[in-house]
Amino acid sequence: KTAIFENWCDFLNYFDASVSVQLSFINQGTQRGEAEKAVNIPAQEDAFNSIRTEYRDMLKNQLAKGNNGLVKAKYITFAIEADSLGAAKSRLARIETDVLNNFKLLGVSARPMTGYERLKMLHGIFHPEGGQFAFDFSWLAPSGLSTKDFIAPSSFRFGEGRYFRMGRKIGAVSFLEILAPELNDRILSDILDLETGVIVNLHIHSIDQTEAIKTIKRKITDLDKMKIEEQKKAVRSGYDMDIIPSDLATFGSEAKNLLQDLQSRNERMFLLTFLVVNMADTKRKLENDVFAAAGIAQKNNCALTRLDYQQEAGLMSSVPLGENLIPIQRGLTTSSTAIFIPFITQELFQTGAALYYGLNALSNNMILCDRKQLKNPNGLILGTPGSGKSFAAKR
């Protein structure tokens, strides 16, 4: 766990002030029938249909314990400013290679998305109720349409201050106020584990190291100046000059600790915007979903605050295009930013001729695997004596 955290810190430190990074976590609902189809065992003309029925019912009960009805996807989008498209492409290609190599060090499999895949992902965000995505780039020239025409929902409505409507869905965008002195690494995973369609986006922008150190030094100078003024006031009033406001003493020590982190502990300063999008069929269901997410934030001494009259900007900032339209940012060091570790649970749910191996201990989702698809299909059964290893192998 410590190694993952340290590697994730190094991953974030790679991005300099010229690169904007967006981490997107999208939980989208699928048709429940698709998951049930994966565990369905059809009847055959023999004497074992009763056993098949019993096993199929057991699999459906196990399926109901988890949230296999949700497809969880993670995306990273990085954006730069350049003088020309050619210069941007060459630099983005170098950044992409470095990002993929850094992911390999983390043990994370990642790949670049094609234009079609990006459009399909955007279509899924704008059509949360589902729907088939039909598109081909060869259709654009004859039809005179643009790619936006193929991904846009039937309607948008942003007239209400605290809600927005998109097609048949009603949604709300909130931002996380990070108030806690110490953050728990489970806050992001707990929000993503909600059995609702939720979209979480982290906009991360690095501050130039020299500029960050200069800014903190200026703050320390300002605090020292205020401290001197308080001491002068104490001398004039005739009481001990060491008695200064507690907030001033606290801010001074925290600023000096922050400066030490930046100068000697391989830390950088980042500006973070944490956005949460909830969507539901009814306003009551939406409020319940937002309340559940706000409860997780409150448990971690943070606050989930609605973006009043900024719903459109919030939704557009929650689309993985690398643009942040919400000017609400929180300054954090590398280690504080890295506490939002997105790699918590590894899921395995294959369809086809997959076998059932049990439930994921963290998420309660089913583990279905078809080992015949792997380069090395061998398996290893571990367990305490008498736990049923031989029986499991014979079964």
Where are these regions (language model features)?
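Glycine-rich phosphate-binding loop of nucleotide-binding enzymes
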Residues: K1, F5-N13, G352-R395
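Extended, folded cores of ATP/NTP-driven motor/assembly subunits in large transport
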Residues: K1-F343
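Homeobox/homeodomain signature
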Residues: G66, G252, E347, Y357-L359, ...
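Pre-P-loop entry segment of helicase/translocase ATPase cores
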Residues: G331-S363
